[in-house]
């Protein structure tokens, strides 16, 4: 018994805690269904990152969608970018398989907003050729 306790204590102290993060990973997929492959991240990776990019006009026209998921040592700026008909969303998380869902990059310009912008851009021409 005197030998068992020190051996047990040494074994417990010598065991290193497994701290590797686990994330879903994929590259340039069209659907989240193809992005459910679990990956064990390296010890330097602290984040699961999801990048979603799309282009389209409201729900009327879709030009394309791309979804990528990976492990990363740092989180890129987690803000969405929307430039009219194209948008990109980035999301980061730090827990076990936390990047299950897609980032919010599916945002598209609204038809109303695009129509208003078009009318405002044509307003000078309409006023010039008016009655």
Curated annotation (Swiss-Prot):
- One matching Pfam family is Toxin_TOLIP
Question: What GO MF terms are annotated?
Answer: acetylcholine receptor binding; acetylcholine receptor inhibitor activity
Q: What is its main location?
A: membrane
List all annotated glycosylation positions: 99
Q: Which residues form the UPAR/Ly6 domain?
A: 21-101
- Signal peptide from the UniProt entry: 1-20
Gene Ontology biological process terms, A to Z? acetylcholine receptor signaling pathway; cell surface receptor signaling pathway; host-mediated suppression of symbiont invasion
Tissue specificity as recorded in UniProt: Widely expressed, predominantly in liver, kidney, ovary, spleen and peripheral blood Leukocytes.
Location(s) in or outside the cell: Cell membrane
Q: Which positions are cleaved off as the propeptide during maturation?
A: 102-131
What CDD domains does its record include?
TFP_LU_ECD_Ly6E
Q: Which GO terms describe its cellular component?
A: extracellular region; plasma membrane; side of membrane; synapse
Q: What induces it?
A: By retinoic acid; in promyelocytic leukemia NB4 and in myeloblast HL-60 cell lines. Activated by IFN-alpha in monocytic cell line U-937 and in peripheral blood monocyte cells.
Lipid moiety (GPI-anchor amidated serine) attached at 101
Q: Gene3D superfamilies per the record?
A: CD59 (2.10.60.10)
What InterPro entries would the database entry show? Answer: Ly-6/neurotoxin-like_GPI-ap (IPR051110), LY6_UPA_recep-like (IPR016054), Snake_toxin-like_sf (IPR045860), Toxin/TOLIP (IPR035076)
The protein's UniProt keywords, in alphabetical order, are:
Cell membrane, Disulfide bond, Glycoprotein, GPI-anchor, Host-virus interaction, Lipoprotein, Membrane, Signal
Q: Which cysteines are joined by disulfide bonds?
A: 23-48, 26-35, 41-71, 75-92, 93-98
Q: Subunit composition?
A: Interacts with CHRNA4.
UniProt-listed PANTHER family: LYMPHOCYTE ANTIGEN 6E, UPAR/LY6 DOMAIN-CONTAINING PROTEIN
Function comment = GPI-anchored cell surface protein that regulates T-lymphocytes proliferation, differentiation, and activation. Regulates the T-cell receptor (TCR) signaling by interacting with component CD3Z/CD247 at the plasma membrane, leading to CD3Z/CD247 phosphorylation modulation. Restricts the entry of human coronaviruses, including SARS-CoV, MERS-CoV and SARS-CoV-2, by interfering with spike protein-mediated membrane fusion. Also plays an essential role in placenta formation by acting as the main receptor for syncytin-A (SynA).
UniProt protein name: Lymphocyte antigen 6E
| Gene (name only) | LY6E
